[in-house]
Amino acid sequence: MLTRNSLYLLLWILFDGGLLTPLQPQPQQTLATEPKENVIHLSGRRSHFQRVKRGWVWNQFFVLEEYMGSEPQYVGKLHSDLDKGEGTVKYTLSGDGAGTVFTIDETTGDIHAIRSLDREEKPFYTLRAQAVDIETRKPLEPESEFIIKVQDINDNEPKFLDGPYVASVPEMSPVGAYVLQVKATDADDPTYGNSARVVYSILQGQPYFSIDPKTGVIRTALPNMDREVKEQYQVLIQAKDMGGQLGGLAGTTVVNITLTDVNDNPPRFPKSIFHLKVPESSPVGSAIGRIRAVDPDFGKNAEIEYNIVPGDGGNLFDIVTDEDTQEGIIKLKKPLDFETKKAYTFKVEASNLHLDHRFHSAGPFKDTATVKISVLDVDEPPVFSKPLYTMEVYEDTPVGTIIGAVTAQDLDVGSSAVRYFIDWKSDGESYFTIDGTEGTIATNELLDRENMAQYNFSIIASKVSNPLLTSKVNILINVLDVNEFPPEISVPYETAVCENAKPGQIIQIVGAVDRDLSPAGQQFSFRLAPEAVIKPNFTVHDFRNNTAGIETRRNGYSRRQQELYFLPIVIEDSSYPVQSSTNTMTIRVCRCDSDGTILSCNVEAIFLPVGLSTGALIAILLCMVILLAIVVLYVALRRQRKKDTLMTSKEDIRDNVIHYDDEGGGEEDTQAFDIGALRNPKVIEENKIRRDIKPDSLCLSRQRPQVEDNTDIRDFIHRRLQENDADPAAPPYDSLATYAYEGNGSVAESLSSIDSLTTEADQDYDYLSDWGPRFKVLADMFGEEESYNPDNVT
């Protein structure tokens, strides 16, 4: 190591002295370069600046990576021309790794690496060196920068960063067809030696594929590899550094290669003849069988198209491809009939949809097979001669008239007789009948075209030998019209004419309607009735298009002379027999302005422009009257409700004055009238009469406070009094009450005041004994409560 570094120093000296000139300078690998010049001021020795050549004898050092020696690895030596070997110069080191990775001998300038280095972790270190005077600590040279490069060794194997790989190549490809390019990377220094020079090779996958040693491009090595023989290939690729030489490191990866399909195989039928059996009753469009051609290709290259080759019976059948199974589905295009033809033979061709022109030389990509179809006999229902029967009949045709017939036949071998009947689910059974054997249809009722113009029902035919086999056909019967109704004028029946009308003015256009409906359409004619032809005020102008105009014949009309005119119009139709009717048009004379706008006529004429008739006006007036009556009734009820609020709460009750010495009817009489009628909210009782004293007389009147004069209350009482006096069913308010009869209770609650004025402790009920035998029960009850002493209870 020392020898190599000494060689670097020697070469630098030779280059610096001009003794050697580099043939091919490579800046990135320069071992020594010419030192830079700098201006140094030497104080005390020179009075001017002088350019001094710096005396460094190095520029770049190298150190091996992954050094595992026991001693620190020697890197190189720093030296200055000012160092005379007297020990007065001190060398310092700073920068990347100074003190941690690299150390320097301050006296000799020797640099050592104190730990193992990895180039892949850090390829070089930039440091700064300086020579200073030991005594003065002043720099002898400006600080200078140098580089220590980590020299690479082959310590990293190649790696496939994108592996494993997946690739594909079409089958039947020629030799050298491109498949895939693989790439391996080596972390070693590619600029130094062969440590990063990778060479590719195939360890597994020959002889099908090959690889370029330098580029890693994989290509086919065999021609015409068939996917149907083998589809998947696994190739093992190796990448080795050191140019593939012995001792180089290697890495491997797997490449999975798939042969993609091409259309190199035509479809083939597994057999040449297919036999099918089809019942003759199979419906049109139904699938009657399947055939299949086999294609070993895959995907769209295996898609097959089937076609029927024109020939015997091919026009009765059709074939389509099932996209899921690639089978040919044979369908029935026309109905089969065993009695007509019992067997059919035709050819079917199968071909690929997507052809590859590279393989046309191998032959046509299609195959042909024969299909034989046998028709099976089926017992079929009768067949009608027509799919639909249309018949016509005049209305009012006599019952039992035959209007048509239907025919059905049994086409099977050994045909059976056929019976006919009307389908009970249709509406024609009650109006028509059918002969079960002959199939003739006759009327069963009188038909009225104005009631129903068309009948639609079904006829069923069944075989006598097998009634379950039936067929059905629709019957359409049109009822023809007989001209039995005269035409009538269409609305309006009324119109108006202005007083200032001129002769020849059309004041109204009228049309006609006819309940008869002729298939060719009706033609109506209009004219005046014979009685109106003499000196007519109006005339009828027939427009020959089923309308007519009412035309004035006078120069002005007077409302005072005649307000209404009645114009008879004769309308005649064109059917046979001819029908006509006379219709009367009412014409009202109205006052109009110069433009013909009606100004005044009558209530109805005002609304003529908007199309309101007399009935509509009457309905509007009736609604207005009903609405007014509802409003008046509502107001009256509101006022009556305000007058009736003369009563307050239920507690304001006026007690009746009862004679207790009367042996009368009792409390049942008091229940027959409404006590609420005597309630008065404005009466306020200031004092109540004590009931615990003996009354002065047998009948005491209740003391009532003065009531202010109120006219409303007085009128109310008098009115109620008169009503009850006039009512013989009303109970008398002054009826006698007999308390010897224990009634159902009194709503007046006249005796409740006995226990409502004071508490039991404050009242003395001895006076009840003085009132006589009638109050003995009350005296005993309250007297016992008064004398009750709980201490005497044993």
Curated annotation (Swiss-Prot):
Superkingdom field: Eukaryota
Annotated domain remarks: Three calcium ions are usually bound at the interface of each cadherin domain and rigidify the connections, imparting a strong curvature to the full-length ectodomain.
GO biological process, one term: homophilic cell adhesion via plasma membrane adhesion molecules
Residues with attached carbohydrate: 256, 456, 537, 545
Cleaved propeptide residues: 24-54
Protein name in the entry: Cadherin-12
Residue intervals on the Cytoplasmic side: 638-794
GO function terms (MF aspect): calcium ion binding
Residues of the Cadherin domain: 55-160, 161-269, 270-384, 385-487, 488-609
Transmembrane segments: 610-637
Main location: membrane
Membrane side Extracellular: residue ranges: 55-609
Signal peptide: 1-23
